[in-house]
Amino acid sequence: YDHISWLENKTIDGIIHEKTVKLLNSNIFVNQQENKDIALKIEKALTNNQSNKYFFGKDFNILKAENGFIQYQDSLGEVLLPEPNLLGDHQLGNISTAIATSRKLFNVKDEDIKKGITKIELKGRLQELKSPSKLKDLVGQNRLIIDGGHNIGASRAISNWVKKQNEDVHLIVGMMKDKDHQGFIDYFKDVVKSITLIDIPNQEGAISKEEFKNKLKGVNKEIYLANSIEESIKSASKYQNTIVCVVGSIYLIGEVLNLN
C-alpha cells in the first residue's frame, strides 16, 4: 500500500492494475507475491502479456531446512543452500526471487549461488552495524540493528524477527507524516522492552516525536522521547544484553549511516 495516496483506485485491484498495465512483453516476469489470492489477481491481470511468467509457490519455492540450511526448488531442480547472511525469515522470499531470476536468465552455477548467498549486502534492512564507529561505541557490547522499513509489512517482518531474539529489544522510531503510525507501532508494543520516538533530522515531511506520541493509543508501556539519534541510542544502551533497533524510515536510516 505504499504511495497509495497517488492512486485513483485505492484498492488491491487498483494497485495491481497500476503495477501491471504498462509492463512490456519481455523475456521474463518473476513474481514473489506470497498471498495466493493476490498472486491469482496478478496472474489474471497479465493474461495478455506474452512474457514468460514465474510465480512464487507455483514455479519456484524456498523452505527452511535442518541445521540452518535452506532448500530452493524450481523446474531446473533443487539446491540445498547455506544459511544466508541476511537477518529475518522474510528475506527468504526475496532471495528465492533473485535465484529464480538468475537461473532463468543466466547460466549460474549452483556453487556460485551457494557462495553468493553468504555474501549478500543489503543496507538498511535488518542491518547490524558491527564495525567500530561513533554509534557502535555508544552501544558498547550490545547490538545495533537498523531497518528503513516504514509500512505494515515491514513492521510485521521486523517484529517477527524480534520475537526470536534472546535479548531484550529497545526500539527507536522516527517516521514520515504520511505513514500508518499506529499500525506500525502496534506490531511492536507487546514484543519490545521499550519504545523511544525521535524526529528525523533534515526532513520537513517527518512527524515530530510529540505528535507521533499523541497519535498512539493502547500502547501498554512507557513511550520515551529523545532529542537526537545519538541520545536515543545512548539511552537505550544503558541496559546490558540488549539489542537497540532503529526503524521507521529510510530517511532516518540514512541519517544513522551518515552519523556512523
Which functions belong to the PLM regions below?
Residues 1-3, 75-194:
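Nucleotide phosphate-binding/pyrophosphate-handling subdomain across enzymes
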Residues 1-81, 95-114:
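Acidic, Mg2+-coordinating active-site environments of NTP-dependent enzymes
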Residues 19, 42, 158, 184-185, ...:
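Hydrophobic side chains in well-ordered alpha-helices
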Residues 30, 171-173, 197, 246:
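Structural beta-sheet core signal
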Residues 34-52, 66-68, 139-146, 152, ...:
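C-terminal helical cap/extension that packs against the catalytic core
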Residues 55-56, 128, 224-225:
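A structural preference for short, hydrophobic beta-strand core positions in alpha/beta folds
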Residues 249:
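Active-site-proximal loop/hinge segments that shape catalytic or ion-binding/gating pockets
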Residues 254-260:
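Active-site-adjacent alpha-helix immediately C-terminal to a catalytic or transition-state-stabilizing loop
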